[in-house]
From Swiss-Prot:
Membrane topology: Multi-pass membrane protein
Record GO cellular component, one term: membrane
Species, as recorded: Loxodonta africana (African elephant)
Spans traversing the lipid bilayer: 15-35, 62-82, 512-532
The keyword Transmembrane is annotated on this UniProt entry: yes
Protein's name in the database: Suppressor of tumorigenicity 7 protein
Gene of this entry: ST7
UniProt entry keywords in alphabetical sequence: Glycoprotein, Membrane, Phosphoprotein, Transmembrane, Transmembrane helix
Known glycosylation sites: N47
Localization of this protein: Membrane
Family (UniProt): Belongs to the ST7 family.
Positions carrying Phosphoserine: S386
């Protein structure tokens, strides 16, 4: 009995819900019935005749004023829509329609059934979006003196923006300074040098820091006992001063490498000394952390110098040793430098081994990780891939894996293919990048374009398949396929990171919504009608009357019906009816 009662209540509840769904139709017919019953007391016929009389007495000036007012309102709507679209990237009318009107009209979001699951991951999604909008240090950044400045001397253009250089200054202050720097004169000078905006002032401060160490040694050595002379001789010079000179004063990579080797000697001594004292207090621990950052930075830049000078195997060995010695320092992303060097050696098995370690779901992705994985998958099938053959026989398993890897990479950063396919010109990469943005695409393609060209057919496979990614993610700002939705903040940050002479890639490409185009057309059409009616009222009246007569004529209706039937016959391929033949006896 209880089950029967429960079933009856469920049926009654469903009937009530169904009746409320179609209740508006009942109300509509009730209103029509009431209007019909009350047509005599409400004097509807008299009111209609009064309205028709009023419309007949209107002059052309009224219609001119009406069309002018409508065009003015349409123009204001157009201006507001354009401003809203430029600021927020979406149409105001479309947003209101989707967000507010569709639920009132009974529209249901496709993801409403998954609200419980999505609500649990809101915090993870927010954290992911914040991390994707974070600006990262470019692991493959160039040398200012030996590369960026040479570009400026040749072209007269500044490849780095003030925002990018300011971020680098903040990084240098974070990595190369600590609270105890004021106790050592050379480090105190370098602490101020990293905050200098003028490059010449920074270089002068670095030279001053090195000179202070020389003067200090010459003055103090004769004044102390012989037992302490050995300790002062072991006192290292200022490693950060050599770093600054190697980065900004050296005009060639060879000069930068020499300065970095001097910095390595100084930095290694500081690191060993602070390593022994790191447990003596928080001050010594901070100093050891700073010396560790300095040593890792120097070794990484030395490996990059060897890579630039053609000693790729030596660079690979230095990077592997550095990753083994300091496995927890992932902030420098040394594995991306290692991947690029291994690709230059065409050591694809070693590249796959590095990817197996770093292409993990728990680790942050990058364009280097995703596109290198796609390159390895494409390398297995690209030499024999043909779009015509694939369309006839279908994709094999290996080809499907390669296409899926390309789609995954394009979803992560959709700007890269245009640079790899040379559909857009490259510029020097910035010192900082935004993941999934145009800056990261430039940094990746600048160093990896040669590796894609070296693999036969890889660019052809990329050209044939990369645009298919966008069919899987029609609304990339709202929902992704393998990654989180594409962050909206990339365009603004990329414009600050990239120079003004570069046209920043925007994804998804902003197209004018239909509402803006419709409003613009309506505004222009009504304004033109108002102008013609004002200038030629009699002629426009004759034209309007003629158009009304044409549309209301029987010939127009017959012609319209015939054209409709002809279209239906063409679409259905209906053969024409055979003509009857008359025989005479």
């Amino acid at each position: 009995m209880a089950e029967a009662g429960t079933g009856f209540l469920e049926q009654l509840k469903s009937c009530i819900v169904w009746s409320w769904t179609y209740l508006w139709t009942v109300w509509f017919f009730i209103v029509l019935f009431l209007v019909y019953i009350l047509r005599v007391p409400l004097k509807i016929n008299d009111n209609l005749s009064t309205v028709s009389m009023f419309l007949n007495t209107l002059t052309p000036k009224f219609y001119v004023a009406l069309t002018g007012t409508s065009s003015l309102i349409s123009g204001l709507i157009l201006i507001f829509e354009w401003w809203y679209f430029r600021k927020y990237g979406t149409s105001f009318i479309e947003q209101v329609s989707v967000s507010h009107l569709r639920p009132l009209l009974g529209g249901v979001d496709n993801n409403s059934s998954n609200n419980s699951n999505s609500s649990n991951g809101d915090s993870d999604s927010n954290r992911q979006s914040v991390s994707e909008c974070k600006v990262w240090r470019n692991p493959l950044n160039l040398f200012r003196g030996a590369e960026y400045n040479r570009y400026t001397w040749v072209t007269g253009r500044e490849p780095l923006t003030y925002y990018d250089m300011n971020l680098s200054a903040q990084d240098h202050q974070t990595f190369f300074t600590c609270d105890s720097d004021h106790m050592r004169p050379a480090d105190a000078i370098m602490q101020k040098a990293w905050r200098e905006r003028n490059p010449q002032a920074r270089i002068s401060a670095a030279h001053e820091a090195l000179e202070i160490n020389e003067i200090r040694s010459r003055v103090e050595v004769p004044l102390i006992a012989s037992s302490t002379i050995w300790e002062i001789k072991l006192l290292p010079k200022c490693a950060t001063a050599y770093i600054l000179l190697a980065e900004e004063e050296a005009t060639t990579i060879a000069e930068a490498e020499k300065l970095f080797k001097q910095a390595l000697k100084a930095g290694d001594g500081c690191y060993r000394r602070s390593q022994q004292l790191q447990h003596h207090g928080s001050q010594y621990e901070a100093q050891h952390r700073r010396d560790t950052n300095v040593l890792v930075y120097i070794k990484r830049r030395l490996a990059m110098c060897a890579r630039r000078l053609g000693r790729t195997r030596e660079a690979v060995k230095m990077m592997r040793d550095l990753m083994k010695e300091f496995p927890l320092l992932s902030m420098f992303n040394i594995h991306e430098n290692l991947l690029e060097a291994l690709l230059e050696l065409q050591a694809y098995a070693d590249v796959q081994a590095v990817l197996a370690k770093y292409d993990d779901i728990s680790l942050p992705k990058s364009a280097t990780i995703c596109y290198t994985a796609a390159l390895l998958k494409a390398r297995a099938v690209s030499d024999k891939f043909s779009p015509e053959a694939a369309s006839r026989r279908g994709l094999s398993t290996a080809e499907m894996n390669a296409v899926e890897a390309i789609h995954r990479a394009v979803e992560f950063n959709p700007h890269v293919p245009k640079y790899l396919l040379e559909m857009k010109s490259l510029i020097l990469p910035p010192e900082h990048i935004l993941k999934r943005g145009d800056s990261e695409a430039i940094a990746y393609a600048f160093f990896h374009l040669a590796h894609w060209k070296r693999v036969e057919g890889a660019l052809n496979l990329l050209h044939c398949t990369w645009e298919g990614t966008f069919r899987m993610i029609p609304y990339p700002l709202e929902k992704g396929h393998l990654f989180y939705p594409y962050p909206i903040c990339t365009e603004t940050a990329d414009r600050e990171l990239l120079p003004s002479f570069h046209e920043v890639s925007v994804y998804p490409k902003k197209e004018l919504p239909f509402f803006i185009l419709f409003t613009a057309g309506l505004c222009s059409f009504t304004a033109m009608l108002a102008l013609l009616t004002h200038q030629f009222p009699e002629l426009m009246g004759v034209f309007a009357k003629a158009m009304i007569d044409i549309f209301c004529s029987a010939e127009f209706r017959d012609w319209n019906c015939k054209s409709i039937f002809m279209r239906v016959e063409d679409e259905l391929d209906i053969p024409p009816a055979p003509q009857s033949q008359h025989f005479q006896n």
